[in-house]
Amino acid sequence: MISYNLSMEFKTIIEPFKIKSVESLPITTPEQRKEYLERENWNVFGLRSQEVTVDLLTDSGTGSMSSEQWAAIMRGDEAYAGSHSWQRFHEVVSDLTGYKHIIPTHQGRASEKILATITVKEGDIIPSNSHFDTTRANFEFAQAKPVDLLCEEGLDLLSPAPFKGNINLSKLEALLSGEESDKVPFVLMTITNNTGGGQPVSMNNLKKVKELCTQYNKMFLLDACRFAENAWFVSQREEDYKDMEIRDITKKAFRLADGCTISLKKDGFGNIGGVLALNDDTLAEAARNLLILTEGFPTYGGLAGRDLDALAQGLKEITDRNYLEYRARSISYLGEKALSYGIPVVQPAGGHALYIDAKTFLPNIPPHEYPGHSVACEIYLLGGVRVVELGTLAFGVAGENGKPDTPATHELVRLAAPRRTYTQSHFDYVAEVLEKLAENKDKLKGYEVIEQPKLLRHFTAKLKPLI
């Protein structure tokens, strides 16, 4: 497995925290797990938490809060307007991002929805290194066209390139200088690039995007859900930033852009929460008006005061170098194990998740039969570990009139690690499940969709295995 300066004094990966409270894990039998999946029409999103032993479905809102965050909850001020909790939250986010207007929301997709509503019109084009599923869906709902312009290195899952989350600058400039430039309201950069395998974006790439946006008079925004993980990779892989504090790198990244959306359920160490931050006064006023209509008053945005305080504290903790190094090493360790079993994974390992290349792993299953979903179901059946497909089921275009789906670029399976939740023993257990997956690969079959919604179908689609 390719890694970058992940060495520590000792080989053992230890959690840089100790456990103060515990929750029992459910242990299920293979027979029970098959029954549960059949009941939910073979969609892992339908599984109940008490039916999952290790839950790697997402790192969003599933992490553990620190004792300082729990203490901050007790300081929560639940005043409807102008609470102390809001003031503390505003101070931390303003210092971190440098943006003029800080608008809290209940989670990231609420920020995306507001942004899409106030900035996008029918026929607009939204370029990005890669849009994630909810981001893409919100822009499509606004009748815009999200366009992914991932760099060439990012398209090669095995490339050792250090910044495979970068945007293709030549393609971006071609769009901004071309006939459809007037259809582009802004450029959105996702850090880290979740869809592209949790890969980081370099500061140099962000600077070049800023230069292009300035040249062509376009707003530059960040989807910054994993801003701290991106900054850690920058500190490891970009020479000019190797001696810089993680928080300082983060501040520089934010200050290149004109605003951002953040799901604080990731690098805010929160179980709920988000933010939309902007410099433009007119857009901020429109955002606040919509916020009042849909989320709540601008000083709480659908969140309790205690949540705002917990998030403010989490945003102080997330840039700890020891924590970020432990997290990256844990994912890299799991990737090394998978490779040793002959399971192809995206390399280098991402910051928040391991991504299995299901297309290469199961070449006998075509994209329209969802090889990634087959892998996800098998991992659950083998060991009660829940993961998610990020391939044609999630990102493809559903076929019409009996025609097969238009496939996604890649067929990936994401194993996303909740923050500060599982120990090294849990990762060893997951590795054993992956070993059994490799042993069973020739037995895996494809799936077909029997019912699906028009948008974000992977969340609620009903499927069945092919015979």
Predicted regions and their residues:
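Short beta-strand-to-loop capping motifs
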Residues: 278, 356-359, 417-419
